[in-house]
Regions:
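N-terminal binding-site loop/beta-alpha segment at the start of enzyme catalytic domains
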Residues: 1-74
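A structural motif
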Residues: 50, 101-104, 137, 159
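Acidic (Asp/Glu)-rich catalytic clusters
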Residues: 10-15, 65-73, 93-102, 153-157, ...
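Active-site groove signature of glycoside hydrolases
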Residues: 96-116
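Short, acidic/polar
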Residues: 32-45, 85-100, 144-153
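Conserved, mostly hydrophobic/aromatic
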Residues: 9, 21, 53, 76, ...
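A short, structured active-site edge motif that brings together acidic residues
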Residues: 74-86, 107-112
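Beta/alpha (TIM)-barrel catalytic core signal, keyed to glycine-rich beta->alpha loops juxtaposed to Asp/Glu
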Residues: 6, 61, 112-202
Length: 202
C-alpha cells in the first residue's frame, strides 16, 4: 500500500490526503459505473494513498462509496442543493442512509455563487452547523465556481471549508480569471478556512 502526503483542512486539524478523489465521473451522470465497479476503483485508489473523496447528493454515487467504505477508511465530503432547514435535513439524512453511517466528515452547500446566495441559504447553513455541534458532521462548507463567493464565504461565518473551482487555464471560473480565484483562495486560506480544489484539470 502506498502513502500520500496528508494535510490539514485549514485550521480544523482534519487530516486528508493531498489529493481528493472526485466521484462525479463514475456515477450515472457520466460513466455510469455500477456500484461494484465504482467501489473497486475507490479501493484501488485507497491502496495508492487516497484517503479523501468527494461526492454530492445529485451524483448518485453513495452506493459506490458505501461499498468501498466496507474496506477503506476514507474521509467523505458531500454537498447538496439545500436552502432551509427542511431541505438540509432531508439531504443529510439521504447521505446517512446512502452511506450507511450516521456521520459525514464534510457537508457543503452545493454551487454557491455570491454573498447573496449565501444569505439566501443561511437557514440551511445554520442547520448544518447545529448538526456539526451534535457530532453528526465534521466540517461545514460550500462549493463554488466564483472567486467572489470564496471571499464572501471566508468571512460569512459557519464555513469551515471551501471547495473552489481552480485549474491552470481558469476554465469554468464564472466571475474572473485564474489569478482572481488564486487570490481569493489565498485570502480564505489565510483566515484558516480549509480549501480543496475542484476540477484541477479543467
Amino acid at each position: 500500500m502506498l502513502a500520500m502526503e496528508m494535510r490539514s483542512l485549514g485550521a480544523s486539524g482534519m487530516q486528508v490526503s493531498r489529493l481528493c478523489f472526485g466521484t462525479l465521473t463514475m456515477g450515472p451522470m457520466q460513466r455510469g459505473f455500477s456500484p461494484e465497479r465504482g467501489a473497486a476503483l475507490l479501493t484501488y485508489a485507497y491502496a495508492r494513498g487516497f484517503r479523501f473523496l468527494d461526492t454530492a447528493d445529485i451524483y448518485d454515487t453513495y452506493p459506490h462509496i458505501r461499498l468501498a467504505l466496507q474496506k477503506c477508511a476514507y474521509r467523505v465530503s458531500t454537498k447538496a442543493y439545500c436552502w432551509d432547514k427542511a431541505t438540509a435535513s432531508a439531504a443529510l439524512e439521504r447521505a446517512f442512509f446512502g452511506l450507511d453511517r450516521e456521520y459525514v466528515d464534510v457537508f457543503m452547500l452545493h454551487e454557491q455563487e455570491s454573498i447573496h446566495t449565501l444569505r439566501g441559504h443561511r437557514e440551511a447553513l445554520d442547520y448544518l452547523n447545529e448538526q456539526k455541534a451534535k457530532g453528526r458532521i465534521g466540517l461545514v462548507g460550500v462549493s463554488t465556481h466564483y472567486a467572489g463567493c470564496v471571499r464572501a464565504a471566508a468571512v460569512f461565518g459557519g464555513v469551515d471549508v471551501i471547495h473552489p473551482l481552480i485549474n491552470v487555464e481558469g476554465i469554468g471560473i464564472q466571475d474572473g480569471t485564474r489569478a482572481d480565484m488564486e487570490a481569493a483562495i489565498a485570502y480564505a486560506h489565510s483566515l484558516g478556512v480549509g480549501i480543496f480544489a475542484m476540477k484541477p484539470l479543467g
